Amino acid sequence: MVAFGAFDLYAGDIASRQLRYQLLRADRSSIYFGRLLGLCITLVAVLSLLGLVVTVYLGLKLGAYPWGEMLLWALQGTLMMVVVSLPYTALCGWISTAAGGSFTSLTLASLAIGGVPLLASLGSLQFDSAQYVNWLLPWGFQSRLLHHDPLQQGLAIGGCLLQTAVFVWLGHRTFLRRDL
């Protein structure tokens, strides 16, 4: 879902040369971080709405748990979906700044997000250490976001935030040096 929302964060406007008109009124960092922040706010709103709809549906249909527990479960699940989506959003932003067009950006983002676990699983058939390729993206630790141990959750959240920071830095660096 994130790849389809973030793949054209910058690529379409870079390809059509529309960003050069914004450069008269704003600097590159403001454009980069403004668009990224806007996408993150939209992503949080969509995931919150999704969590609310699922919770209300399960609460009305099943009725097996009290509403307080259901809302806490939904809050935790939604928060973890947001946390795991941040690195993918930043990765798509980086790819979008580097790609020459929208379709190229979508293709590269899909290959990166889907290719990492595929490469890890196929590579681990031959080499056991190839499974560590999963750690390039949150694939390696995203299942620990819903772990019962707070330490495991904290480490997974920290890993997602660290990857987000790295991808945002790479995207910003690429955007600053890119010909718009």
Which residue ranges define each predicted feature?
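Secretory targeting signals
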Residues: M1-D8, F33-F103, P150-Q153, G158
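Membrane-interfacial segments
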Residues: A11-I14, Q18, V53, Y57-P66, ...
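Helix-loop-helix units of permease transmembrane domains in multi-pass membrane transporters
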Residues: L9-C40
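Terminal transmembrane helical anchor/hairpin motif
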Residues: L106-R177
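Short, solvent-exposed coil/turn segments
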Residues: A3, I14-S16, Q152, V168
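Residue-level signal for alpha-helical context at structural boundaries
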Residues: L24, R28, L49-L50, W67, ...
